[in-house]
Amino acid sequence: XKKPVRVAVTGAAGQIG
């Protein structure tokens, strides 16, 4: 799979913003 790096960053940014 894909590494949960982009997902983590995107999820955090989405929750914060």
Swiss-Prot record:
Q: What does this protein do?
A: Catalyzes the reversible oxidation of malate to oxaloacetate.
The Swiss-Prot or TrEMBL record describes its family as follows: Belongs to the LDH/MDH superfamily. MDH type 2 family.
Q: Does the keyword NAD apply?
A: yes
GO molecular function, a single term: L-malate dehydrogenase (NAD+) activity
Keywords for this entry? Answer: NAD, Oxidoreductase, Tricarboxylic acid cycle
> Any idea which positions bind NAD(+)?
G11, A12, A13, G14, Q15, I16, G17
Extract one GO BP annotation from the record: tricarboxylic acid cycle
For this protein, what reaction is catalysed?
A: (S)-malate + NAD(+) = oxaloacetate + NADH + H(+)
Question: Would the keyword GTP-binding be found if you checked this record's keyword annotation?
Answer: no
Enzyme Commission code: 1.1.1.37
Q: What is this protein called?
A: Malate dehydrogenase
